[in-house]
């Protein structure tokens, strides 16, 4: 009987040791898996945040000049000329009836996520992004400048999408053109328009669109294709598409409830 009890105790001890070892192994496996997942998520978060950032805007102009005229009167005249020049390029109208001028040229700046924009709108877009983040909203530039070839590619994809739904070629083309501009008539080809979406981690699309709708004008941007202006713009509602027109024009457009076509008609 004592021998039997001895063996029983030994077996019980072995089972206990085995179970304890299994628990420790499971615990270590959990800790390692949790650590790996945490590191991966941290890496992804940093990657996304880097992709949302615009390149730093230099505090001073890097050209050879000082940027300040010796004669105050000359400086005032230069400022007035710059404002006039900005109105000329920032208010250019591009739509189905007004294609991009044949000799139109643009100097581009590449953002940290690879998208490009007209270098002249860069500081305003940076200010917009900084203000949004300060309010707890995290946007990204999903699309900036496009070449003619890229615009054609997007158009072809949209036409194919409608054809797959059973539309004829003519119907598919007509429907696609309410969403995608015909190459040569897209504001993206100006470098003045950006499609802005949410980062997908800190903000939702609706949060970003709402913030932009209420605040973008303060930085010179307008919601180019609002839902109640489709008959005028010829483009369906796009809450992500924003166009730089300058702070003065954007403020008037916002407060008067206009689209760019209407604003330009009132300014004639």
From Swiss-Prot:
Regulation: Carboxypeptidase activity is insensitive to beta-lactams since it is not affected by penicillin G or ampicillin and is inhibited only by very high concentrations of cefalotin and cefoxitin.
Induction behaviour: By vancomycin, mediated by VanS/VanR. Part of the VanB-type operon associated to vancomycin resistance in E.faecalis V583.
UniProt subcellular location: Cell membrane
Gene Ontology BP term (one): peptidoglycan biosynthetic process
Topological relation to the membrane, as annotated: Single-pass membrane protein
List of residues binding substrate: 151, 179-181, 186
Primary location class: membrane
Described purpose of this protein according to its UniProt entry: Carboxypeptidase that cleaves the C-terminal D-alanine residue from the peptidoglycan-derived pentapeptide L-Ala-gamma-D-Glu-L-Lys-D-Ala-D-Ala in vitro. Therefore, should contribute in vivo to the hydrolysis of the D-alanyl-D-alanine-containing peptidoglycan precursors. May increase the level of glycopeptide antibiotics resistance by decreasing the availability of D-Ala-D-Ala termini from the cell surface, which constitute the antibiotic target residues.
Family annotation (NCBIfam families): vanY_BG (NF000473)
Protein's name in the database: D-alanyl-D-alanine carboxypeptidase
Organism of provenance: Enterococcus faecalis (strain ATCC 700802 / V583)
Upper classification of the organism: Bacteria, Bacillati, Bacillota, Bacilli, Lactobacillales
């Amino acid at each position: 009987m004592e021998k039997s009890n001895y063996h029983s105790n030994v077996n019980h001890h072995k089972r206990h040791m085995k179970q304890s070892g299994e628990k420790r192994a499971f615990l270590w496996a959990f800790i390692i898996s949790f650590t790996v997942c945490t590191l991966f998520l941290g890496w992804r978060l940093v990657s996304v945040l880097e992709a949302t950032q615009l390149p730093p805007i230099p505090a001073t102009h890097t050209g050879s000049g000082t940027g300040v005229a010796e004669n105050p009167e000359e400086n005032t005249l230069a400022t007035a000329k710059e404002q006039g020049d900005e109105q000329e390029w920032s208010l250019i109208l591009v739509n189905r009836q007004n294609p991009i001028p044949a000799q139109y040229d643009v100097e581009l700046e590449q953002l940290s996520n690879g998208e490009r924009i007209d270098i002249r709108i860069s500081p305003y877009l940076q200010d917009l992004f900084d203000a949004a983040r300060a309010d707890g909203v995290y946007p990204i530039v999903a699309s900036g400048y496009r070449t003619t070839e890229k615009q054609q590619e997007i158009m072809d994809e949209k036409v194919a999408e409608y054809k797959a739904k059973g539309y004829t070629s003519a119907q598919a083309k007509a429907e696609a053109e309410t969403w995608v501009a015909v190459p040569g008539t897209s504001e993206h080809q100006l470098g003045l328009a950006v499609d802005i979406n949410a980062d997908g981690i800190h903000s939702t699309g609706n949060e970003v669109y709402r913030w932009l709708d209420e605040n973008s004008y303060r930085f010179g941007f307008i919601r180019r294709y609002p839902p109640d202006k489709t008959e005028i713009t010829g483009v369906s509602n796009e809450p992500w598409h924003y166009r730089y027109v300058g702070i003065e024009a954007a403020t008037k457009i916002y407060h008067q409830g206009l689209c760019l076509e209407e604003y330009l008609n009132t300014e004639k």
